[in-house]
Structures are given as structure tokens and as C-alpha cells.
A protein has these predicted regions:
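A carboxyl-terminal module marker
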Residues: 591-627
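Catalytic core of carbohydrate-active enzymes
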Residues: 266, 278, 288-294, 313, ...
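Short alpha-helical segments and helix-capping/turn motifs at coil-helix boundaries
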Residues: 11-20, 25-30, 83-90, 155-160, ...
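Alpha-helical packing segments of well-folded alpha/beta enzyme cores
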Residues: 83, 154-158, 198, 231, ...
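Aromatic- and glycine-enriched glycan-recognition loops and surfaces
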Residues: 22-26, 80-83, 115-226
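Aromatic- and carboxylate-enriched substrate-binding clefts and catalytic-loop regions
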Residues: 1, 168-378, 410-414, 418-419, ...
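Secondary-structure transition/turn motif
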Residues: 45-47, 563-570, 623-624
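Catalytic and substrate-binding clefts that recognize carbohydrates or anionic sugar/phosphate headgroups
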Residues: 1-145, 159-160, 480-507
């Protein structure tokens, strides 16, 4: 992860853990590079390095590591996928995140601080404002479960808060802060029980729990019960399913960091009933992707620079064999800027993970923290992210041994314009979405309504995802209207997008329905992937693929074919309701359906409500509300 960069021609980059989190810093280096000329190189070393891509001498690549011997793997292959798979053959394939990991996570410390009334503090549910202190100032001490007349300051209250504001939440880390721990008893086992109590409550509400790492993960003599750790009991007894590493534990990086995530990567399935590990790390190296996703470090939100440099950072991470990349929502520090806050939530809808790192910023790091209009906009995009889960999960599975989820434009559309930095502020999310985030104030008014310039639309026809307006490709789009609510995102004509019902966590997904949104054009297809979303079964071949095809005939007729699902997994629902959302320009003359060789008679519904309640029905929405 080279922050702020992905195209290195004419540059020198450092291959070392710098613990530098802003533009130009190195968060998680990999001693590997590949070229569009059809080759790649990986150094087998943990030593620091410098890679010069024609900076000192044009046309020459000069690589060096602080080592007295040369140990390098050379890879000769055709294309990004083949070269990435050569790298994975040596270092391991990227992990497929559990489904809950695609939802927001909330991170803070809820076992350490004291809260006193203060008119300039944070407004709580009792109508009063409070300020926190890490020192005992006579205030109310927080706890995980709120059992000490302190519920509104507890970790349980966080879960309630998301629920009461109708906001999606997938997981919670209650000890993300130095000296926090997760219990206030005199024994480690007592604290484990306290953590389990939180875990039970969280799981009842569709939320998983995890832990931040400050120290050794296994019992160690001389460490107080507060900071003592036992990862085996945390996983086996308390139900921990997430681990976030930080510089206090893997700050050395290199082999130490790699061994650390590998340890947890083996413990979680073994002691967690085959649970799929969800590890978020930094200071990674070649091989980190086998066990963990990466976060980019601690940065300041509330400023446009935060969004700007992260776009090429995410693109570069996928190109470097680490498709599971994330960062804090609107930063860990700073904030109080509605425009930046909403724009960050918007573009990260089309990324794997979202972290609300609370407790350090100018405001609380909740999606509703800045009030309206940010609350409604953020909620709407979070719900959209939940709807897109079948599409996101399918491209995440592809990223295990194929294209990354977040794709540089040149991966799908290689040409002189895309093979450089001209398109560094836009990307493809899978094969069908083109995302062009708002990363600066161009002509913004006081409400944050703005425009986006320099959007490159490749060949083909591209459709504004929120208005349905069509644009011919092979052009640069300027002055694209982007009111505060609107992310510039385009869907390729011919797209097939698997969807699910809007939801707040994986438990709310209706497994008995499958939804496909289609933009018929020519002949196109998409392979949907699904599995249980929680276990390591997928590594043993347990999963289901469904091929969906769309074809526009010579008479402008559209045929959509869903082929029989292949495979199986624990909990797979074989009998499902199927809903098509087919984007057309006028009412079709005829709509027919066939299941196998059996024709199904369809009835025209008179309203959306009748359509939603009916079976074997169709409805033509002449003016759909796309936003």
C-alpha cells in the first residue's frame, strides 16, 4: 500500500514499513511489482528496499534491498490476473471476507474512560452533554455491558444507537484504545465472561464482536488482568470473530507482523467452529493478503485531501495483490465537515469495508453524527451497500484468484490514456460500475452541491446509475452535476447486477429471494457466487455459482436466462422467489416466462404494491424513482 499512488513510472518508491499514513507514505509494502509488458518480480526478503522506475535513468528499472545476497522470483505471464496469480502461488491467495465484514464496523474503547457533564460535550440519550477523560475525575466510568448505571456509555448502547437510527452495522470492537481491556474483574476469566456477555447481546442483534490488539495475544506472566489476553478463549468462549492489529503489536511489521496475523488466521477457524477469520492489519508484507485485509492507518478527516489520496491508494492496493483494503470513515481525527463526510460515505459504498473509528475526532464517528442532511444521505448509501451484497460478494470471490474488486481503468480498458495517472481518481467496481468520487470542491455552493470534471468513460454506453441518463463512451465528461446527495457512478449498458433486500446486517438478508437488475444491451453475462458467508467451507469447494445471461435480439426483444445453480453449501436455500428489474425505455409489447420447459403465465400488476404482494406478475414503472 503506497498511499496516494498506484502508477510508479518515473518515481522511486520505498519498500519498507514507515508507519506513515498520509500521501507519499508507505502503510503496507510488498516487495513485488509487475509490468503491463508481461513480467513480474518478487524479492524473497524482509529487508528494506528502494524501487526506481526510471527516476534516475529514463527507461531503466533499478531495484535494491538492504541485503548482501540476491533472492528473486521472476514471473513471465500475460496480463494482470496471470501475474497476480503467480504472486499468489508464492505467497497465498487473498482471503474472502465474511459477509458481515462488508458492513460498517464501529471501533472505540468502552472499558476505560470516565464521563462528566459538560455543556460543550457530546449529547447523549438522557438529553445531557458529557465529556470523557481517561483519568478518574469522579465521573461515571463506562463498561462494555452498561450494568453499573452507565448504560448510555456502554458498548451495548452503540449497537442500540445504530439500530435506533436505522443504520447498518456489521461488527463492533469495544477495546480499541490503549489501556482499555474488555473487563473490570480481577481475573482474565472474569473479563472473558464480560466480553462473552457483550458478544451474546451483539449476536442477538446481528452484530459480531472483535478485538483490537495492543499486546501479546496469549497469556503472559506479570500482565494485569485488565490487559491480559488469551486469544483462544476470546475466540472459543466469547465468540470473537474480528481482530484489528495496530502498531503497538505489529509495528515492526515484516516477519513479525506476518507471523502475528498467521497465528490468528489459524486460531480463529480451529477454536471458532470453522469461523472465517476477519483480520484487519497494517504494516503488512508479501503474504499478508492470505490472512488479512489492510487499513491505511490513522489520518485526519473533514478535509478533501483525505478522500483524494485514498482513491489511488485503494486502486494500487488491488494491483499489488491486496484487494481487501479499507480506511476510517471520514478519518480517525478531525471531521465536522458535512460535505467531506457525506462524500466519503458515498464512494466507500463501492469498496469492501468501512470503519467508524470513534473517540478521537472533532465529532463522534457515527453515520448520523452530523445531523441532517448527512444522516439521511449516509443511511441511503449504507442501505445501498447492503443491497449490493450479492454483487459485491461475487466480485470479492473473483478477487481471490482474479481481478481485484476495485479496478484501475486500464485493467478492463487498456489504452494510452488509462495506463498512467490520468484516471487515478476513478475506478471500476467489478465489471459493471464506474465510480468517480467527489474528492475536491470544484464549484460547490454553500450546501455542497458541486460538479465533477474529468470523468473518463471508456468505449460502450454508460448509464447514470441514479437518473438513467445515457452517455456514449470514448469521451471525457466534464461539468457532471453532483448535488450533495449524488455520487457520480455509472453502470455499463449490458450490466447484470445481483441484489438483495435493503438490510442492516446479514441476519436481515432474505435468503428466499434473489433479485437481478439488468440493463439489456447486446449479449452479456454475470456469474453470481454465494456461500455460507461465515466459515472456511468455501476453501473446501462449498459454494454456489449461478450464471445469468442477457441478450437483445434482432427484433429488439430481450431474453434473460438464469441457468441452474451449481454447487451447494450449508444453509443454501434452493427454492427462491426470483425478481427481475429490467431497465427498458418503453412498455414491452409482451412479457413471457418459462421455468425449464414449463411456460408460466404472467399477470400485469396495476401498482407497485400489487406487484410486491403478487406471484407470477410483472409491472411497468414508467417513471421509476432511481434515487
Amino acid at each position: 500500500v503506497q498511499n496516494g499512488r498506484f502508477s510508479h513510472k518515473g518515481k522511486v518508491i520505498s519498500i519498507e514499513n514507515q508507519n506513515s499514513w498520509t500521501d507519499g507514505g508507505v502503510a503496507s509494502p510488498t516487495p513485488y511489482y509487475w509490468s503491463t509488458n508481461g513480467y513480474g518480480m518478487m524479492w524473497y526478503t524482509f529487508k528494506k528496499g528502494k524501487y526506481d522506475f526510471g527516476a534516475s535513468e529514463e527507461g531503466k528499472v533499478k531495484l535494491s534491498h538492504e541485503s548482501d545476497y540476491l533472492d528473486v522470483f521472476y514471473m513471465i505471464n500475460d496480463g494482470a490476473v496471470a501475474l497476480l496469480n503467480d504472486f499468489y502461488q508464492l505467497t497465498g491467495n487473498p482471503v474472502l471476507l465474511p459477509k458481515f465484514g462488508f458492513y460498517q464496523g464501529h471501533l472505540n474503547a468502552y472499558n476505560r474512560d470516565y464521563w462528566t457533564e459538560n455543556e460543550k460535550g457530546i449529547l447523549f440519550e438522557d438529553g445531557k452533554r458529557y465529556k470523557e477523560s481517561q483519568k478518574d475525575n469522579g465521573g461515571i466510568k463506562e463498561s462494555l455491558n452498561g450494568e453499573k448505571n452507565n448504560y448510555q456509555f456502554s458498548a451495548r448502547a452503540v449497537i442500540d444507537r445504530y439500530k435506533n437510527h436505522d443504520m447498518p452495522l456489521g461488527w463492533l470492537l469495544p477495546n480499541d484504545g490503549y489501556g482499555a481491556g474488555y473487563g473490570q474483574t480481577e481475573t482474565l476469566d472474569g473479563n472473558i465472561q464480560n466480553l462473552k456477555s457483550l458478544g451474546d447481546y451483539a449476536r442477538q442483534n446481528g452484530v459480531e464482536i472483535g478485538l483490537w490488539t495492543q499486546s501479546d495475544l496469549h497469556p503472559k506472566e506479570g500482565v494485569s488482568a485488565l490487559l491480559q489476553r488469551d486469544i483462544v478463549k476470546e475466540v472459543r468462549d466469547a465468540g470473537v470473530r474480528v481482530l484489528k492489529t495496530d502498531v503497538a503489536w505489529v509495528g515492526a511489521g515484516y516477519s513479525f507482523g506476518l507471523n502475528g496475523v498467521a497465528d490468528v488466521g489459524h486460531i480463529m477457524p480451529y477454536y471458532g467452529s470453522d469461523a472465517r477469520p476477519f483480520i484487519i492489519s497494517l504494516d503488512g508484507w508479501a503474504g499478508t493478503q492470505r490472512y488479512a485485509g489492510i487499513w491505511s492507518g490513522d489520518q485526519t478527516g473533514g478535509v478533501w485531501e483525505y478522500i483524494r489520496f485514498h482513491i489511488p491508494t485503494y486502486i494500487g492496493s488491488g494491483l499489488s495483490g491486496q484487494p481487501n483494503i479499507t480506511s476510517d470513515m471520514d478519518g480517525i481525527f478531525g471531521g465536522r465537515n458535512v460535505q467531506v463526510n457525506t462524500r466519503d460515505f458515498q464512494w466507500k459504498t463501492f469498496t469492501p469495508m468501512e470503519l467508524n473509528m470513534d473517540g478521537w475526532g472533532a465529532n463522534e464517528k457515527y453515520p448520523h453524527a452530523l445531523g441532517e442532511p448527512a444522516t439521511s444521505i449516509n443511511r441511503w448509501y449504507l442501505k445501498l451497500k447492503s443491497e449490493l451484497m450479492p454483487y459485491a460478494y461475487s466480485i470479492a470471490k473473483e478477487a481471490v484468484d482474479g481481478m481485484p474488486m476495485i479496478r484501475a481503468m486500464f485493467l478492463e480498458y487498456p489504452n494510452a490514456y488509462t495506463q498512467g495517472t490520468a484516471t487515478q481518481y476513478q475506478y471500476l467496481y467489478g465489471p459493471y460500475f464506474l465510480v468517480a468520487p467527489i474528492y475536491q470542491a470544484t464549484k460547490a455552493d454553500e450546501q455542497g452541491n458541486d460538479i465533477r470534471n474529468g470523468i473518463y468513460l471508456p468505449e460502450g454506453v454508460w448509464i447514470d446509475y441514479f437518473t438513467g441518463e445515457k452517455y456514449d463512451g470514448n469521451r471525457i465528461l466534464n461539468n457532471f452535476a453532483a448535488p450533495l446527495w449524488k455520487l457520480p457512478v455509472f453502470v455499463k449498458n449490458g450490466a447484470i447486477i445481483p441484489l438483495t433486500n435493503p438490510n442492516n446486517n446479514v441476519n436481515e438478508i432474505d435468503k428466499g429471494i434473489r433479485i437481478y437488475e439488468l440493463y439489456p444491451y447486446g449479449k452479456s453475462s454475470f456469474t453470481e457466487y454465494d456461500d455460507d458467508g461465515v466459515s472456511e467451507e468455501y476453501k473446501r469447494g462449498k459454494g454456489v455459482t449461478t450464471n445469468i445471461e442477457s441478450e437483445v435480439g434482432s427484433k429488439n426483444d430481450v431474453t434473460v436466462t438464469i441457468h441452474p445453480a451449481k454447487g451447494d453449501f450449508t444453509g443454501f436455500v434452493k427454492e427462491k422467489v426470483t425478481e427481475f428489474r429490467i431497465n427498458v425505455t418503453s412498455l414491452p409489447k409482451k412479457v413471457t416466462a418459462q421455468v425449464g420447459k414449463k411456460k408460466v403465465k404472467l399477470t400485469k400488476a396495476a401498482s407497485k404494491d400489487e406487484f410486491a404482494k403478487g406471484e407470477d406478475v410483472f409491472f411497468y414503472d414508467e417513471a421509476p424513482d432511481l434515487n
